[in-house]
Structure formats: C-alpha cells, structure tokens
C-alpha cells in the first residue's frame, strides 16, 4: 500500500498548521509542519551568531537537520518565522529541505504536510490538497492573540506589516512561490472556527481515504 498524503498550503497565520495537526490526529497519520524545517535552519544560524544569508553554513545545517527534533513550541516565535521566510528564498536550501520533506511523505500509513508549496512542489501527487485562506487582518489578529496567550508582548500593527511583507516575499519568490495547486480545495477561514474548518476538510477527505483503504 502506498502512503496516503494530504497537502495543506496557505499564507502565514491562516490556520493551516492547527488544521493539519487535527487532521493528522483524526486519521492517525504522521504530520510535518514544513515551515519548521526552515525555522530550524534559521535557528541554527542565529544560535551561532551567523547571518541569514550565510549560504555555506545554512546548507550544512539544512543537510544535518533532524526532523524528529523540530519542536513547534520552541520554534514558533514570530521573529523566527520572519527569519525562516528569508531563508526560504535560497533555492539551494529549498532543494535540500524539499527532498527531505518528500522522504518524510513516503512514511506509512501516510502523512499530512503543511506549508507553502506542498501541493505544487513537494507532493504534487498528494491524494488530496487544501489551500487555506484568510484575510491579512484576521491573520494578524490571530497571531497577535496567540502571542499574548503565551505570555509574550506584541504590537498588532507590526505583526500586520510583517505578514504583508512576508506574503509579498512568499508570493513573488522565484523558487516555489506561494499559490494554490490547480486541484486544491480552497477554504477561506476568515469567518470560520477551527472546528468548522476541520469539519469541511473531513467531508472532502472521508470519501477519498475510504477509496484508498479499499483500493
């Protein structure tokens, strides 16, 4: 049996990560937040006081990165996300990490991968694809509230500005720009709770995963 793969893409703070984790738990699949792989490389550079454009060391860290050590709570800071967005512009680093992400997707019984180029580049043959949308104001508010909930300090307008710049970088970069796969289901979560989004996603997944199991 080949692994069952679910691809979830979307801009920063759209809710794709939360959705991916719920789907993976519900269907007993492995989960990979591919954004954490770029954050992991960025963190390694910053820990060694190296510049984000230090390609030689970034390549080394990308090759050595152990996906099993990626910790969402540890790598989830807004600042690290900004750094990872810049790391992701490097085509050599993307190539290394994409290959490792594809190998992860081969794990049985299957995986849910979320990121920005899963359905288009990493797993173009995924069994089902989603593209999660939300307007930038809603995403900024979510990120702001998330930081406050964790006891951190944040400025809503700075977060909004950062997300707008990040969207621009992700959409316009030459390598793997952020865009929906042609056969992706588009879900706008601006006015939806995570429970409602999850229910809609499951309504698309259920018939396909049943066919996969039978087949």
UniProtKB/Swiss-Prot annotation:
Its EC number is 2.7.4.25. GO terms for biological process: pyrimidine nucleotide metabolic process. It comes from the Bacteria. Its main location: cytoplasm. It catalyses: CMP + ATP = CDP + ADP; dCMP + ATP = dCDP + ADP. It is found in: Cytoplasm. Belongs to the cytidylate kinase family. Type 1 subfamily. InterPro entries: Cytidylate_kin (IPR003136), Cytidylate_kinase_dom (IPR011994), P-loop_NTPase (IPR027417). One of its GO terms (molecular function) is dCMP kinase activity. Keywords: ATP-binding, Cytoplasm, Kinase, Nucleotide-binding, Transferase. It holds the Pfam family Cytidylate_kin. One of its GO terms (cellular component) is cytoplasm. ATP binds at residues 10-18. It comes from Bartonella tribocorum (strain CIP 105476 / IBS 506). This is Cytidylate kinase. The lineage of its organism: Bacteria, Pseudomonadati, Pseudomonadota, Alphaproteobacteria, Hyphomicrobiales.
């Amino acid at each position: 049996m080949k692994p069952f793969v679910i691809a979830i893409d979307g801009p920063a703070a759209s809710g794709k990560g939360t959705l991916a984790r719920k789907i993976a738990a519900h269907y007993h699949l492995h989960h990979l937040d591919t954004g954490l792989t770029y954050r992991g490389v960025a963190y390694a550079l910053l820990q060694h006081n190296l510049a984000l454009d230090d390609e030689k060391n970034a390549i080394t860290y990308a090759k050595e990165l152990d996906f099993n050590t990626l910790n969402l709570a540890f790598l989830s800071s807004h600042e690290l996300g900004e750094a990872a967005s810049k790391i992701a512009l490097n085509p050599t680093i993307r190539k290394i990490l994409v290959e490792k992400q594809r190998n992860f997707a081969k794990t049985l019984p299957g995986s849910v991968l979320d990121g920005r180029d899963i359905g288009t580049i990493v797993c173009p043959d995924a069994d089902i694809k989603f593209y999660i949308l939300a307007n930038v104001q809603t995403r900024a508010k979510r990120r702001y509230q998330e930081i406050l909930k964790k006891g951190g300090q944040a400025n809503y307008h700075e977060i909004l500005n950062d997300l707008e710049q990040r969207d621009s970088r992700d959409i316009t970069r030459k390598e793997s720009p952020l865009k929906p796969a042609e056969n992706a289901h588009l879900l706008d979560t601006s006015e939806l709770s995570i429970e409602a989004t999850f229910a809609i996603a499951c309504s698309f997944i259920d018939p396909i995963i049943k066919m996969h199991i039978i087949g």
